[in-house]
A protein has these predicted regions:
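Short, aromatic- and glycine-rich surface loops/edge beta-strands on solvent-exposed regions
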Residues: 135-138, 266-278
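Short glycine/proline/serine/threonine-rich loop/turn segments at secondary-structure transition edges
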Residues: 85-89, 129-133, 146-147, 211-212, ...
Length: 601
């Protein structure tokens, strides 16, 4: 745990003390005729329902549990504001996630809007407030539009395949904070292992008249309470850069000299405290943390801190029975991470979802590797390109500082780019996203289209749900060259590379396999033939997992999946997070060193 940790604080790497959680009971109304704006509901509406924010109306935990489609919904609550605090501070309201178009009014006056369901956004509503009680009204517009990023949300009136009940409206924490008028707006932290330093990029909000020697930003770095360094930087513009030393020299504290690096085995984290100093007075303070770790590609290998990394991943869709995409509590997030570790995995693919940032915090703390994805659209149009690009860039910037994230994965299985194998326009789109991602983060690998039909990609990932281990293994040993040159389809009708692209020696990971259907519900589904006993399950799991690990050039795998999700019954746990088989048995199979992994031991 790090110094700045506050339970339930949503923005875990940028922590201020003066905040308020606005989750809880809100007035609520369906607007199925979409007449609310015309009738000025933002000035007050007759809500005959209440809802428990941040749970969506489709869920049991919302208190409503209506899985029907309602494209326009309204929320209302009162907020208390101290006018005295507003003299030196701005009042900012944050939405961690609200799907899809969110409009906000304060005391009947329009505050702003945001498009996109998965990225954090905020509004400074200071100018609209009065002392004491204020009314906050929110309208959210959603749809079954296949052009908007929707991930695993269905776009018809019933569940099908691996698509589930839609998520409409506010589904993550809503909160507020008083922010000093001169403040640290954001900080980008990049570890530099070679120089034993942390590269810092500050965004500072202040009048231009204060820029210069009278305005400073201080960063104080410590490790387990031991001071490491302090760097003070003059703010000469809204964007300034600095470098902080992270080399431990305090052997009298019982700590070894050197740089403490982050890995799944030893997830060491440094604390850092930021201060904005104006004319000698501290006007803003932010708590944070960071890690020193390097992820890079070296030919067919993925290196973490200079050492080959074998990834034992599991697909994690982040759904819960009674709350769907919204975690029921912070403890539920911790439980998932601990149980994934108990199963012998060192990482996960957070699939088609931008998870609550508290989850990333606990992955940082507990040493869980994360592949970061984004919700897919399912139709290729100019509008879809625009919506996807904007939201993906917001997400990459939002989560850049988390050391647990080692890979960006913007596309999955050609969803939203269904003709990518042959259409240049769709290929160019994925290339553009690759290079845009690299323009923000030049260090992490980018997997442009996970599973098949790769264009430009730092890692080649393949999906294969073959249920016979020997067939799975021999396919990739006997036909490696033919698969990578697309002479042979590795997954029925899918090729590894899109037309016009060649394999260039990148690392290869089997990033989806397994998906064994196993529970007592005959109506559910998984991949391949369902198993009926624990013994059958373990036998197949062992055979296919061992088969994947015995492919000598494959440097990792990702099993489908953590838990059952609604009609999909192929989890290692059910939706209540009960293990289906003894986790120690699964752990032993996962941690057995064979093939590529054994060659580096």
């Amino acid at each position: 745990m790090v110094k700045c940790y506050v339970k339930d604080y949503p923005r875990t790497q940028f922590v201020r003390k003066n905040w308020e959680n606005l989750n809880g009971t809100w007035d609520f109304a369906f607007d199925d005729k979409n007449c609310g704006e015309k009738e000025r509901w933002y000035e007050g509406f007759k809500g005959n329902l209440t809802i428990q924010v941040p749970f969506t109306y489709e869920t049991k935990m919302s208190g409503i549990q209506d899985e029907g489609r309602h494209d326009n919904i309204w929320y209302r609550r009162q907020i208390q504001v101290d006018a005295e605090k507003l003299k030196k501070n701005n009042y900012v309201i944050h939405f961690e996630g609200s799907d899809f178009v969110t409009k906000v009014w304060v005391n009947g006056q329009y505050a702003g809007s945001h498009r996109g369901g998965y990225a954090r956004f905020e509004f400074d509503i200071s100018a609209l407030l009065k002392d004491g009680e204020n009314e906050l009204v929110v309208k959210v517009e959603d749809s079954f539009d296949m052009q908007q990023p929707r991930g695993k949300q269905r776009w018809i009136d019933k569940n099908f395949g691996c698509w589930y009940v839609q998520t409409t409206g506010i589904w993550k924490t809503v909160w507020s904070e008083y922010v000093p008028k001169v403040n640290l707006k954001a900080v980008k932290m990049t570890p530099n292992m070679e120089e034993h330093a942390l590269e810092l990029e500050y965004e500072v909000e202040a009048p231009e008249t204060l820029m210069g020697e009278e305005l400073l930003v201080s960063a104080s770095v410590s490790f387990k309470g031991v001071p490491v360094s302090r760097v003070i930087t003059a703010v000469t513009s809204g964007h300034v850069e600095a470098r902080a030393d992270v080399f431990l020299r305090h052997n009298d504290y019982g700590l070894e000299w050197g740089v403490r690096s982050w890995s799944p085995e030893e997830p060491d984290l440094y604390d850092v405290e930021f201060q904005v100093i104006c004319r000698g007075e501290v006007v803003d303070e932010v708590g944070s943390y960071f890690a020193m770790r390097e992820i890079r590609i070296d030919g067919p290998n993925i290196l973490l801190n200079g050492r080959p990394l074998y990834q034992r991943l599991i697909l994690d869709q982040g759904y819960w029975k009674d709350s769907h995409l919204t975690p029921p509590s912070e403890e539920a997030l911790i439980e998932d991470i601990d149980k994934i570790h108990a199963l012998g995995y060192n990482g996960l693919r957070k699939h088609q979802k931008t998870e609550d940032e508290r989850f990333l915090y606990w992955c940082d703390v507990k040493g869980m590797l994360v592949w970061s994805e984004v919700a897919a659209a399912y139709q290729y149009t100019d509008y879809a390109v625009q919506e996807f690009t904007r939201e993906w860039m917001e997400i990459v910037k939002q989560n850049y500082n988390h050391p647990c994230i080692i890979t960006w994965t913007p596309f999955n299985e050609s969803w939203g780019v269904s003709h990518i194998e042959t259409r240049k326009q769709e290929q160019h789109f994925t290339e553009a996203i690759y290079y845009l991602t690299k323009s923000i983060d030049k260090y992490r690998p980018v997997i442009v289209n996970d599973g098949w039909e790769h264009t430009v990609s730092d890692i080649i990932t393949l999906h294969d749900y073959e249920e016979v281990g020997e067939i799975l293994k021999n396919r990739y040993i006997d036909c490696k060259d033919q698969i990578l040159t697309t002479e042979v389809y590795h997954s029925n009708h899918k090729s590894a590379m899109a037309n016009g692209y060649q394999y260039k020696g990148q690392p290869i990971i089997i990033s989806e396999y397994g998906g064994i259907a196993f529970n007592n519900d005959d109506s559910g589904w998984g991949y391949g033939n369902k198993v009926n006993t624990k013994e059958e399950f373990v036998k197949r799991f062992d055979e296919i997992t061992t088969g994947v690990k015995e492919i000598p050039y494959v440097c990792g795998f990702c099993y489908t999946q953590v838990s059952d999700v609604q009609q999909e019954i192929n989890g290692l746990m059910d939706m209540e997070r009960n293990f289906k088989v003894d986790p120690e048995v699964i752990r032993e199979i996962n941690e057995r060193k064979v093939g590529y992994w054994r060659s580096f031991m």
